[in-house]
Curated annotation (Swiss-Prot):
Entry's Gene Ontology BP terms: apoptotic process; cellular response to arsenic-containing substance; cellular response to calcium ion; cellular response to hydrogen peroxide; mitochondrial outer membrane permeabilization involved in programmed cell death; negative regulation of apoptotic process; negative regulation of ATP-dependent activity; negative regulation of intrinsic apoptotic signaling pathway
Modified residues (N6-succinyllysine): 68, 87, 176, 191
Protein name: Peptidyl-prolyl cis-trans isomerase F, mitochondrial
PTM: Acetylated at Lys-168; deacetylated at Lys-168 by SIRT3.
Source species taxonomy: Eukaryota, Metazoa, Chordata, Craniata, Vertebrata
């Protein structure tokens, strides 16, 4: 699969990767960093989960995510259960296999670790739940896919506003704490998506 990476009208390069469920993206229209914030507290009652992340065996820190179960309950439950590992499989020990600075950090392939695998708690794939939530800024948590209704376990965290993905990828949460850790992950990425260090989810689970 070949994916074009654009900043405005200028073609910066082509991204190549294994043929499968890489984050399927149209041309990137902008490379500006947003300043959006989701706040530090919530009274929604939505689940809070965490990802502890390391790079080449060195801890980077913890990312805490709020899952929008009030808007996309099925998608949120899939991610929550993959964080806890309660179904017998999940994100612990898997990698951020594709990281593009000023764009996004992609992870969730816990079977092949390269963007070609992963599975949901509902089976191999499940449908797009809805597109009510938008890719409004840094810290947005969204599902990677290989086209409509092909959600599995792969996800990405945006590091800029990516509104051209609205209606194509299901947003289901956002970073509550640890955006500095996301930026550290981003620093090991490249325009091709290949990371300079092995970035691993060393632990994960549910906080509330």
């Amino acid at each position: 699969m070949m994916l074009a990476l654009r900043c405005g009208p200028r073609l910066l390069g082509l991204l190549s990767g294994p043929r499968s469920a890489h984050l399927r993206l149209p041309a990137v229209r902008a490379c500006s960093s947003g300043s959006g914030s989701h706040g530090s507290s919530s009274s929604s009652g939505n689940p809070l989960v965490y990802l502890d992340v390391g790079a080449d065996g060195q801890p980077l820190g913890r990312v805490v995510l709020e899952l929008k179960a009030d808007v996309v309950p099925k998608t949120a439950e899939n991610f929550r259960a993959l964080c806890t590992g309660e179904k017998g499989f999940g994100y612990k020990g898997s990698t951020f296999h594709r990281v593009i600075p000023s764009f996004m950090c992609q992870a969730g392939d816990f079977t092949n670790h390269n963007g070609t695998g992963g599975k949901s708690i509902y089976g191999s794939r499940f449908p797009d739940e809805n597109f009510k939530l938008k890719h409004e800024g840094p810290g947005v948590l969204s599902m990677a896919n290989a086209g409509p209704n092909t959600n599995g376990s792969q996800f990405f965290i945006c590091t800029i506003k990516t509104d051209w993905l609205d209606g194509k990828h299901v947003v289901f949460g956002h970073v509550k704490e640890g955006m500095d850790v996301v930026k550290k992950i981003e620093s090991f990425g490249s325009k091709s998506g290949k990371t300079s260090k092995k970035i691993v989810i060393t632990d994960c689970g549910q906080l509330s």
